[in-house]
Amino acid sequence: MAPRFPKFSQGLAQDPTTRRIWFGIATAHDFESHDDITEERLYQKIFASHFGQLTVIFLWTSGNLFHVAWQGNFEAWVQDPLHVRPIAHAIWDPHFGQPAVEAYTRGGASGPVNIAYSGVYQWWYTIGLRTNQDLYTGAIFLLALSALFLIAGWLHLQPGWKPGLSWFKNAESRLNHHLSGLFGVSSLAWAGHLVHVAIPESRGEHVRWQNLLTALPHPRGLEPFFSGQWSIYAQNPDSTNHFFGTTQGAGTAILTFLGGFHPQTQSLWLTDIAHHHLAIAVVFIIAGHMYRTNFGIGHSIKEILEAHTPPGGRLGRGHKGLYDTINNSLHFQLGLALAALGVITSLVAQHMYSLPAYAYIAQDFTTQAALYTHHQYIAGFLMTGAFAHGAIFFIRDYNPEQNKDNVLARMLEHKEAIISHLSWASLFLGFHTLGLYVHNDAMLAFGTPEKQILIEPVFAQWIQATHGKALYGFDVLLSSANSPAFNAGQSLWLPGWLDAINNNSNSLFLTIGPGDFLVHHAIALGLHTTTLILVKGALDARGSKLMPDKKEFGYSFPCDGPGRGGTCDISAWDAFYLAVFWMLNTIGWVTFYWHWKHITLWQGNVAQFNESSTYLMGWLRDYLWLNSSQLINGYNPFGMNSLSVWAWMFLFGHLVWAIGFMFLISWRGYWQELIETLAWAHERTPLANLVRWKDKPVALSIVQARLVGLAHFSVGYIFTYAAFLIASTSGKFG
């Protein structure tokens, strides 16, 4: 008889109920809990899976390039980036009638196509690609790279090629490889590509393999580099009337510090970007060589941490014991990585629209909206995941003996103070923000809008002024013509910055008022509450006053009976589960704010946001309802249009979201009864009863039902907003 699923758990494989399938799927990636797992095999499996991950990523990016080259309109878009709509790929759908075929035939295509809102066209254009041939070449290169990584993953699972445990735990060598090898050298390579290919292309000079070694990126070649006259590389930058992609107005500089945006493309100067990557490369290549690897010189991370004791001894033993705790816990490392990557992803969202790096992307409004929203949602999931693995670390990997009186132990010791302070901050923000909104609603409802409480964000405006925004009249630092910072900025560094920050047509330091003040605090409420739930979940994961032995129950347990006063909803998993709802709601507010602020900016009616954002009805009526009108009437008895698919997705997203509640608001017993009734009916129905199943059907566990509910809630929520965002933006701006 063939071995039953799951092979990794004999106990589960022998379970006679459908629980075997669901628990098997749920624990498939929890390698630590599998039969016959050793620490070494655990590390080897994860290491090999990284190659698989890279394979999938390169295959996906290769597919993007291939489909645009095959079915897109890249060459036509390059001729007129502001008016040609970029095509992602063709659509073949047997359900399309003639009206649909006509509605989706756009961008100069011969049949129905999807428009690209990912920004890849702008990116490829900026980095020097110009023809479909370029795209095909890139696709084939990435496909080969993908195959290479797939082979590497397989290879590192073979007996002679499996790294040992000591190799995985060598922190200094890993830092050397990651900082210098991956970050440093790749940044240097990218700076090289920008200087040798992208910048010449932006000046009308076509550099490809055949002339790469003969075309000088700078007229003086390497002579200024070796003679130490590096400033020569910054002289003669592109002029403000440079026509991107041509020699008109082009300069010869390759590494500059201009600041601001290229007037025509509304994106950062390519020479500034190249300079940035070169600087990053230098910093990281040096950083990666500071640690002790083969030669007995440089820092030892363990020694640094052991020596790091706070002065005066009042803060305990500092970082003693942390090295082994972190180095022996994959969950701790993953938690740190997710937290860092989550923050970086959110920063990417903020910087992609305020400091656009790709030519013409700032004028592609739907793409700007899609990229901002996408990166904020990704950041939310990464950040919540960080706390989930932090909690698992405390349950599975934390050793109190190893960490006596160090920073970790002290966090646990004063967790009540941390949790109660977060709770206080959340309550304060919530009641005051809601109170202001509701007061303003009441005033508008009673016909006295002048009695609203409107608070100017003076501190934030002052910070904007210090960075050079003159509108508020603060006359401080960069907004003061008398300050040394202002004078240096005119010549020494970033001369283009002040023009950019005071130009109202971009998204740099947007003008803010009372509506921004309120929504800022609403978002702060969401962030603090999400953090409260996550921090409490992690700090209470080992035990709490109510349930001191919680760690014995593991990461996710539904209840521990009535004996302790009813300990349901108390596991670390439950905290994560609750936090994800808060995370999604908070990002909802963040994206609503960003999107509404920007559509009024792009349409030239910022007064609508300023006037309507100070009360809740304004948000509901003038943002959500007004912008969903095209979706609510997306297709009707009189026909359809190119927004119909988004209207359908808007409905479908609501449906998926609502299905989530079916799993969230119910009791397990109800489902078990229902399932047994259905099984009974099935067994007594002719023909149907010829089909039998081996496993006895049982209801999902409480935790599993919550997971399924949460998954539907999240997916439906994101689908709904994605359809709303893309349709309302593309419907207005084409």
From Swiss-Prot:
Cross-referenced InterPro entries: PSI_PsaA/B (IPR001280), PSI_PsaA/B_CS (IPR020586), PSI_PsaA/B_sf (IPR036408), PSI_PsaB (IPR006244)
Residue positions binding phylloquinone: W671
Q: Topology with regard to the membrane?
A: Multi-pass membrane protein
Q: Under which name does UniProt file this protein?
A: Photosystem I P700 chlorophyll a apoprotein A2
What UniProt keywords are attached to this protein's entry?
Answer: 4Fe-4S, Chlorophyll, Chloroplast, Chromophore, Electron transport, Iron, Iron-sulfur, Magnesium, Membrane, Metal-binding, Oxidoreductase, Photosynthesis, Photosystem I, Plastid, Thylakoid, Transmembrane, Transmembrane helix, Transport
Q: Which residues bind [4Fe-4S] cluster?
A: C559, C568
Q: Write down the NCBIfam families for this protein, in alphabetical order.
A: psaB
Give the EC number(s) under which this enzyme is classified.
Answer: 1.97.1.12
Residue ranges of the TM segments: 46-69, 135-158, 175-199, 273-291, 330-353, 369-395, 417-439, 517-535, 575-596, 643-665, 707-727
Q: What role does it play?
A: PsaA and PsaB bind P700, the primary electron donor of photosystem I (PSI), as well as the electron acceptors A0, A1 and FX. PSI is a plastocyanin-ferredoxin oxidoreductase, converting photonic excitation into a charge separation, which transfers an electron from the donor P700 chlorophyll pair to the spectroscopically characterized acceptors A0, A1, FX, FA and FB in turn. Oxidized P700 is reduced on the lumenal side of the thylakoid membrane by plastocyanin.
Subcellular location per the Swiss-Prot or TrEMBL entry: Plastid, Chloroplast thylakoid membrane
- Organism expressing this protein natively: Psilotum nudum
Q: Its catalytic activity?
A: reduced [plastocyanin] + hnu + oxidized [2Fe-2S]-[ferredoxin] = oxidized [plastocyanin] + reduced [2Fe-2S]-[ferredoxin]
Q: What is the lineage of its organism?
A: Eukaryota, Viridiplantae, Streptophyta, Embryophyta, Tracheophyta
GO CC terms, sorted:
chloroplast thylakoid membrane; photosystem I
